[in-house]
């Protein structure tokens, strides 16, 4: 026996295995609509594990008694005890009561014998009702006939279907019930119809009964139909050959008219394994009992089981049935999608599109689309609705989708969660569905939902209320605050009426609406409030049908600024109902629990205008215009800002007008504002006129409320300039005029201001004028070894003040010097020996051209040995000393003869020296050490008492950025070189040496006196000798001194 397909053997077992591995999927939000989940009718199986609810149907019994029944198939139910059979399945009929266990077993008399096997025949795999006053179809697709060949038997699982009367009893007088319905030949094998499994699907129309047989022809499958017209009976089957088996044609089946023909019927049958992607065949009747293929709609994903569930419904009310196809195993891993419903909209009876008009998805692992059913117009809006089961999403869910003039709405209008029903043991809720019948006779069709957990649930539809004449009127419609009283400014009148969407004229229930009125909802603070309170919100109740209208008073708030835009008074309403917190069992009337039609707007609004001087149309057409410019403190327009660190203020001049033009009336501009957005470098300092502007994240200036016709206004805004850097190229302000009056040409104005950054570095010298000397002997270059051999030292110290911000890669600060290098005949003048830079660190500067110490003479080290013989006389301070400058002989003589050598003269040849100055926040010292070339001065300037050598140094900026500049700083420097030095002042003698010398002198003087006395020096001489001595002394006094003799030579 081949593995014949069935919802039991081929689908149920793997699904039951999957159920243990499923996880609860995320809940999909959907507002509850009119299928009630609080007052339930629940039925349970008497025998657990019978799969009670595997198939369900709603049925109306009109014979013998008037009642509505819930039909449930239990294909694994125990058999009626006969001593031979254990399990056959069953069909139960359940009355509409509050009891769970009052279902009755339908009497299907079938006994087991050697020629056929009813054990495990799955009676109840298909249950269908023909509709009001119609018959009932029950199938057992695993019914097996036995062929005997001697002692051996061959079993043929051909399936069997039973038709019973409206009262679910067998009426032998009814040909529908007595006909054998044996469409499959058990004398053939599985390659023909010997394993057809008839009844896997089936149903009724008014004059036909149809069956699906997916096991026929090697499980290619087939569809059968029996049609009765008066006393004629015709059998139809699909006999077109297919290329392969295992298509499962007939797995599901629907028959109806207005599909591909206005009146003729079309058979729609699913083949979920066609080409591995599944398909739906559309078949039509042909003469001779054949069903001809008209169209095949194929699935899009392998293994999705496209075609395992189908439904027909006129979704857009165009008179043609549209097609819905389930693919419960469709998935998109990245999108967390599990299951799909394909919607094919009928193209006016010609065909269906090859691709779905709409594709609905369910959550991952939900088997969304395992069941799908047309449930009628559940909300009575004129369009058919559908239900989709997702039995493995949590405990199971049922999605309700509504039809519309555009077709099926994409979003579900209601999602019914199995968890919310509060039924212990419930699982796989939504496994089977049946609708299109109003079992509680409230004019709304209800829905029966089955499961694999031996439970079925009836969900009844609640009445839907349409709110009519929801009028909201405000008086006066144009408000003049001058006419407001202490108790009222505005009167609001609201009126309601309703009807039932099903049009039941007897439905006259007392309904109370809860409504909320809100004044100026979109503005804070609001401009109106209700007289009963200080609030702009009012909550009230409205009883229908007794109450017709209500009137409320509103007052105007104080200090209302906005008198241009209307005040909107909005109203929304709802229908509060007291429902039980938990679901209850019972069949009480749902008329007391209506719901509002969600397709209607649940709110309304009206507007109140202010009285304005804006013409007869009450619309203010303003003509705000603006001119703006950055200006200097003298009022001059600026196109470029010359920025310096000491710059503090920048002014912005703005002129605003509201004058009529040819295009605009120039009427009052209400709530006229000027908004400025400026960069963080501009900080608001002051405004003229004072108080016109306020600064927060932006600068907002109030121009007037209103800014009247022909009014003009000038604003002068002062900014403090902070944070401008070398990278700042432009300052940009954006200005925007706004008004609540009508003016649609207001555009932002962008006001750019280019920035030229002026650096403010400084240059100074420690000593602008140095003094030195020359003298001694002439020495050639070849004889010089150290810089001391060149001449007396010079030391120039320049100080560069910090410029504030570092240039980095934007440029370089450079100290340049015109250096007196040679005299006109090419002899050395001032010989540079070393340039050092001290800032953030210390380093040597080497200008290009090998101009510093080009002879590579050995530099002097401070403190090394005595000076050379040429420097034995006292040397002059080379500059930078703390004491007074030494006085030369020439200086003492007031420099009788002097010559000046300077760069730019014919006597001097100068070279250009450059040293880059690094970025530093501190003063940078540049020290230039040099030597007077002694030999040049001795040879060429020995006739001069003083030679003055003068030049200059310039600090300048070298950059390629045109917006960065700096004023060059120039200092002049010189050195006076004298031809000789004054004699050195005597050195100070220590006190103890003076005392010793005085004592020694006194001792020597005493010894001399003693010797003179011994020699008789002190004895009185004769008179003659005395005179001779005096004469001699006088002669001595007349002789000139040595100094006098020296001066007489000059």
Curated annotation (Swiss-Prot):
Keyword annotations of the record: Calcium, Cell adhesion, Cell junction, Cell membrane, Cell projection, Cleavage on pair of basic residues, Disulfide bond, Glycoprotein, Integrin, Lipoprotein, Membrane, Metal-binding, Palmitate, Phosphoprotein, Receptor, Repeat, Signal, Transmembrane, Transmembrane helix
Residues covalently joined to lipid (S-palmitoyl cysteine): 1015
Post-translational modifications reported in the UniProt record: Phosphorylated on serine residues.
Localisation per UniProt entry: Cell membrane; Cell projection, Invadopodium membrane; Cell projection, Filopodium membrane
Residue windows of the FG-GAP repeats: 38-103, 108-170, 184-234, 235-291, 292-353, 355-410, 414-476
Molecular-function annotations in GO: integrin binding; metal ion binding; protein heterodimerization activity
Entry-listed glycosylation sites: 86, 264, 499, 510, 572, 604, 655, 696, 840, 856, 925, 934, 968
Transmembrane parts of this sequence: 991-1011
Motif (GFFKR motif): 1016-1020
Topology of this chain in the membrane: Single-pass type I membrane protein; Lipid-anchor
Signal sequence residues: 1-32
Function summary: Integrin alpha-3/beta-1 is a receptor for fibronectin, laminin, collagen, epiligrin, thrombospondin and CSPG4. Integrin alpha-3/beta-1 provides a docking site for FAP (seprase) at invadopodia plasma membranes in a collagen-dependent manner and hence may participate in the adhesion, formation of invadopodia and matrix degradation processes, promoting cell invasion. Alpha-3/beta-1 may mediate with LGALS3 the stimulation by CSPG4 of endothelial cells migration.
The protein's name in its UniProt record: Integrin alpha-3
């Amino acid at each position: 026996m081949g593995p014949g397909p069935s919802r039991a053997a081929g689908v149920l077992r793997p699904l039951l295995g999957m159920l243990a591995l499923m996880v609860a999927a995320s809940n999909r939000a959907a507002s509850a609509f009119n299928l009630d989940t609080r007052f339930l009718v629940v039925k349970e199986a008497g025998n657990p594990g019978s799969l009670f609810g595997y198939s369900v149907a709603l049925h109306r019994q009109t014979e013998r008694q008037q009642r509505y029944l819930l039909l449930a198939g239990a294909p694994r139910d125990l058999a009626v005890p006969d001593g031979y059979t254990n399990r056959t399945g069953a069909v139960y009929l359940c009355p509409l009561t509050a009891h769970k266990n009052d279902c009755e077993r339908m009497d299907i008399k079938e006994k087991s014998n050697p020629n056929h096997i009813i054990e495990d025949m799955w009676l109840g795999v298909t249950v269908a009702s023909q509709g009001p006053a119609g018959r009932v179809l029950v199938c057992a697709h695993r019914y097996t006939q036995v062929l005997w060949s001697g002692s051996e038997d061959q079993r043929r699982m051909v399936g069997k279907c039973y038709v019973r009367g409206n009262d679910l009893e067998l009426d032998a007088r009814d040909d529908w019930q007595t006909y054998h319905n044996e469409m499959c030949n058990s004398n053939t094998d599985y390659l023909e119809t010997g394993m057809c499994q008839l009844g896997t699907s089936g149903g009724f129309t008014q004059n036909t009964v149809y069956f699906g047989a997916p096991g026929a022809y090697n499980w290619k499958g087939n569809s059968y139909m029996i049609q009765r017209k008066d006393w004629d009976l015709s059998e139809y089957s699909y006999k077109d050959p297919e290329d392969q088996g295992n298509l499962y044609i007939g797995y599901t089946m629907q028959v109806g008219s207005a599909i591909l023909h206005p009146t003729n019927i079309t058979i729609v049958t699913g083949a979920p394994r066609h080409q591995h992607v599944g398909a739906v065949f559309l078949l039509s009747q042909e003469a001779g009992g054949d069903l001809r293929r008209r169209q095949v709609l194929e699935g899009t994903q392998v293994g999705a089981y496209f075609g395992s569930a189908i439904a027909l419904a006129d979704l857009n009310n165009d008179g043609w049935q549209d097609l819905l196809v389930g693919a419960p195993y469709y998935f998109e891993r990245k999108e967390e999608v599990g299951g799909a419903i394909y919607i094919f909209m009928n193209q006016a009876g010609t065909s269906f599109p090859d691709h779905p008009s709409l594709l609905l998805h369910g959550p991952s692992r939900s088997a969304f689309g395992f069941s799908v059913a047309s449930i009628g117009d559940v909300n009575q809006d004129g369009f058919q609705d559908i239900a989709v089961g997702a039995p493995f999403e949590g405990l199971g869910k049922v999605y309700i989708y509504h039809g519309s003039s555009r077709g099926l709405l994409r979003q579900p209008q209601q999602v019914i969660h199995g968890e919310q029903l509060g039924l212990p043991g419930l699982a796989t809720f939504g496994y089977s569905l049946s609708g299109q019948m109003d079992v509680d006779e409230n004019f709304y069709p209800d829905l029966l939902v089955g499961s694999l957990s031996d439970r079925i649930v009836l969900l009844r539809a609640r009445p839907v209320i349409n709110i009519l004449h929801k009028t909201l009127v405000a008086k006066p419609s144009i408000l003049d605050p001058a006419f407001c009283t202490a108790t009222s400014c505005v009167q609001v009148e609201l009126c309601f009426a309703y009807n039932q969407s099903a049009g039941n004229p007897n439905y006259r229930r007392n309904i109370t609406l809860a409504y909320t009125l809100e004044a100026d909802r979109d503005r804070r603070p609001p401009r109106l409030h209700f007289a009963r309170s200080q609030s702009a919100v009012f909550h009230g109740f409205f009883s229908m049908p007794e109450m017709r209208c209500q009137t409320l008073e509103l007052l105007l708030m104080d200090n209302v600024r906005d008198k241009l835009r209307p005040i909107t008074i909005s109203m929304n309403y709802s229908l509060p109902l007291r429902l039980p917190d938990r679901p209850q069992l019972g069949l009480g009337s749902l008329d007391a629990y209506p719901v509002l039609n969600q397709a209607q707007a649940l709110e309304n609004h009206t507007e109140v205008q202010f009285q304005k001087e804006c013409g007869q149309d009450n619309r203010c057409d303003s003509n705000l215009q603006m001119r703006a410019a950055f200006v200097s403190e003298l009022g001059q327009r600026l196109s470029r800002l010359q920025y310096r660190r000491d710059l503090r203020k920048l002014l912005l001049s703005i002129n605003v007008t509201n004058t009529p033009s040819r295009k605009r009336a120039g009427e009052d501009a209400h709530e006229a504002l000027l908004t400025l957005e400026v960069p963080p470098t501009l900080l608001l300092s002051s405004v003229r006129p004072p108080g016109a502007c306020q600064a927060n994240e932006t600068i907002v200036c109030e121009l007037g409320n209103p800014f009247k016709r022909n009014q003009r206004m000038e604003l002068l805004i002062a900014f403090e300039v902070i944070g401008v850097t070398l990278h700042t190229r432009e300052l940009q302000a954006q200005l925007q005029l706004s008004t609540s009056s009508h003016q649609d040409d207001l555009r932002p104005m962008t006001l750019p201001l280019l920035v030229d950054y002026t650096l403010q570095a400084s240059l100074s010298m420690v000593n602008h004028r140095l003094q030195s000397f020359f003298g001694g002997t002439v020495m050639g270059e070849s004889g010089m070894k150290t810089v001391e051999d060149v001449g007396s030292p010079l030391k120039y110290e320049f100080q560069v003040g910090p410029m504030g911000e570092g240039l980095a890669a934007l440029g370089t600060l450079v100290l340049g010097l015109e250096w007196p290098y040679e005299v006109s005949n090419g002899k050395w003048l001032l010989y540079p020996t070393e340039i050092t830079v001290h800032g953030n660190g210390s380093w040597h500067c080497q200008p290009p051209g090998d101009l510093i110490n080009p002879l590579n003479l050995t530099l002097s080290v401070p403190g090394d040995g005595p000076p050379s013989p040429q420097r034995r006389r006292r040397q002059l301070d080379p500059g930078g000393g703390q004491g007074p400058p030494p006085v030369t002989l020439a200086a003492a003589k007031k420099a009788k003869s002097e010559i000046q050598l300077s760069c730019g003269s014919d006597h001097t040849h100068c070279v250009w020296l450059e040293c880059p100055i690094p970025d530093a926040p501190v003063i940078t010292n540049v020290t230039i050490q040099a030597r007077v070339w002694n030999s040049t001065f001795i040879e060429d300037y020995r006739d001069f008492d003083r030679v003055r050598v003068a030049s200059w140094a310039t600090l300048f900026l070298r950059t390629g950025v045109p917006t960065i500049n700096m004023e060059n700083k120039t200092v002049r420097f010189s050195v006076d070189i004298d031809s000789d030095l004054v004699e050195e002042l005597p050195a100070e003698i220590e006190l103890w040496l003076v005392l010793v010398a005085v004592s020694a002198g006194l001792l020597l003087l005493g010894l001399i006196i003693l010797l003179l006395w011994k020699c008789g020096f002190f004895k009185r001489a004769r008179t003659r000798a005395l005179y001779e001595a005096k004469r001699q002394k006088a002669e001595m006094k007349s002789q000139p001194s040595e100094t006098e003799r020296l001066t007489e030579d000059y």
